[in-house]
Amino acid sequence: MPRRPSTGTQSDTPALHVVPSFYGVYLLQSEPKPSSFYIGSTPDPPRRLRQHNGDLKAGGAYRTKRAGFRPWRMLLVVYDFPSKVSALQFEHSFQHCHETRHIKQEERISKNKLSGRTLHHKVANVALLLRSSYFRHLPLKVLVFEEAVYNSFMNNKFVTCSHVDLLNTNFNEYFSVMEKDLDSTVDSWKTRHTNENEIWSMAKEAVILGSPRCALCLEPIEQVPETSSPISKRSDLQRYLQSESLPLVTMCYNPQCRDVFHLSCLGHRFTNSDGFQSLIPATVNRCCSCNAKLEWRTLAKIATKLRYYVLKDSLQLPSQVLENDDNYESQNVNDS
């Protein structure tokens, strides 16, 4: 039977990737049944936990709705994924630690689908994934909300937990949106978004409203699309982006610098510095102008957000193009 012609399905919808402000993979534990765990991913952990516990009617997951398992508590969140796709890759690997390609067979502590049900196993598997050849190149961090989980990392029963970027905190305090007299250097949900809003305002002023040149190649930067034709297909958008008519542009977010760069120019400089060549930039680099420390993830976030800001109206892109939904339902609950 011949294939039916495309009717503009979701897979054909043009979508621009934007590095999310927050995307994490979380581990839940049932309070009535402590040996039952659930693994999922979300851009909004407080909202997601309320869905799992039935406080919100919409959302949640079938497996966490079963009688006798609620309430659930969130034990940890692995976060700072550069995309929803990379978060789902980590989530799937976390759910299938006994067979994932991201943990070497000789290093696996979960030997089959039914093994690895203790908290020590969960913590050790997180650490194994974080040091894998793929995920270690992402600047991933771990939030821990329970003392027992933190102690498990510290005890390091399976000798896997070295070099984990760990923050031991309180779930409600970290994700609080209430005004608090917090030190601006404290890592929290509120200060994180406040800092990002300030950086975004600087970026728009420097790149969109100004007439900058790349501080490396000295070429002028024009953030104006060369076409106003609406784009209705993903393939059309890909062809437009590959034409390099609107390159990714970023900015040093040191307020005393604010120099503008092509992301490709920075990437080339960061991967060919000090006579050493690497495949990808380090997670933290130095500004070529002011020598301030810059996170590559933040530079990429600025660049993708600027591109979306410029293109979304000019090319009449659909409004829902960001990777920020959490409708994916995990299929992994370990029951006692």
Swiss-Prot record:
Transmembrane segments: none annotated. It comes from the Eukaryota. GO terms for molecular function: 5'-flap endonuclease activity; crossover junction DNA endonuclease activity; zinc ion binding. Its cofactor is a divalent metal cation. Keywords: DNA damage, DNA recombination, DNA repair, Endonuclease, Hydrolase, Metal-binding, Nuclease, Nucleus, Zinc, Zinc-finger. The keyword Nucleus applies. The keyword Chaperone does not apply. Pfam families: GIY-YIG, SLX1_C. One of its GO terms (cellular component) is Slx1-Slx4 complex. Its EC number is 3.1.-.-. A zinc finger (SLX1-type) spans 214-290. One of its GO terms (biological process) is double-strand break repair via homologous recombination. Residues 21-104 form the GIY-YIG domain. SUPFAM superfamilies: GIY-YIG endonuclease. It is found in: Nucleus. Residues 37-57 are annotated as: Disordered. CDD domains: GIY-YIG_SLX1. Forms a heterodimer with SLX4. Catalytic subunit of the SLX1-SLX4 structure-specific endonuclease that resolves DNA secondary structures generated during DNA repair and recombination. Has endonuclease activity towards branched DNA substrates, introducing single-strand cuts in duplex DNA close to junctions with ss-DNA. Belongs to the SLX1 family. PANTHER family: STRUCTURE-SPECIFIC ENDONUCLEASE SUBUNIT SLX1. This is Structure-specific endonuclease subunit SLX1.
